[in-house]
Amino acid sequence: DSQWIFLPAIKRTKRISSSNRTGKFVSSEFSYEDLGSEEVADNDYLWLADMPCPTDESLSCAQVESYPKNPRSGYSKRVSYTDLDEYRVHKIEFYNRRGDLEKILTFEDYSQYLGQYWRSHNMIMENIQTGKSTRLNWGEYSFRKGLTEQDFTPQALERYSR
């Protein structure tokens, strides 16, 4: 599973090695692992409870632990809070390999696209151990643009930047 990042400032594409997925993403509180995609089969799950959502108590959330199967993961587990009405993730707690709470990711300002896709416009990652945080703001999402896997090769990413 290759992971690449395009760096527009230097107009280059860089491969992220699997051993660096736990490293910081451009000096932020996010790691490359935090920003990558994953499949349901990549984790084992344990439902803990249905409870009020920690970010909006008027909503009910499922509290679920997930345990990564990948031994190279930087986390021993994650605890997520997903609302039961629209299945939007509101918060994820990340526990390091020693089992200590390391970071909390909070999702804010959701919008629905094409009548079905909920996306957060603000993601705040707080490092509990250092007190530092990083906010990612997303301005606009686009769907159904006809992109293929070939549009995301390192060569294509560099070509589109010209």
Language-model features, listed with the residues they occupy:
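Gly/Pro-enriched, hydrophobic low-complexity segments
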Residues: S2, F6, R12-S17, R21-E38, ...
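Short, low-complexity, Pro/Ser/Thr/Gly-rich segments in the mature regions of secreted, periplasmic
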Residues: E149-R162
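Surface-exposed beta-loop interaction hotspot
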Residues: Y32-T55
